[in-house]
Amino acid sequence: MDFQGHYPEPGIQLLGLKTSNITVNRIIDSRRVVVSSTDQIDSKTVYALGAHHSKEPPPINNLPFETCESEIFNFPVPGFSSSYRELEIVGHHILGSHCMLVGHVINAKQRINSHSSFYQIHRFEYPGSGYRDI
């Protein structure tokens, strides 16, 4: 996930992936995705999973951790996830090199009490956007 954020309307979440990510069209076609949060794994493992976004993801049994299934979609969720959200994709927009996905949260599950999550913060703008520096 290259960016994610909440929308002012309750239950809506915005996600962004590079258009070169092999899973983008699968997510759009299936209209389903699961997003998890954690503070139980190191950033090196997280980055290793997304290092080759233009290649086929590894088989579930080749992952370096255990998984469980999400309640509604039965999608694999990393066993170390403190929480996850199952989203129905209700729209998408191509924004240059990225695809913004608009998802409706249909299930949110807190699995483990978490102290903090791993976040990577980006600044997203395009030339001539008129955004002022913060």
Where are these regions (language model features)?
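Basic, polyanion-binding surface patches
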Residues: M1-I134
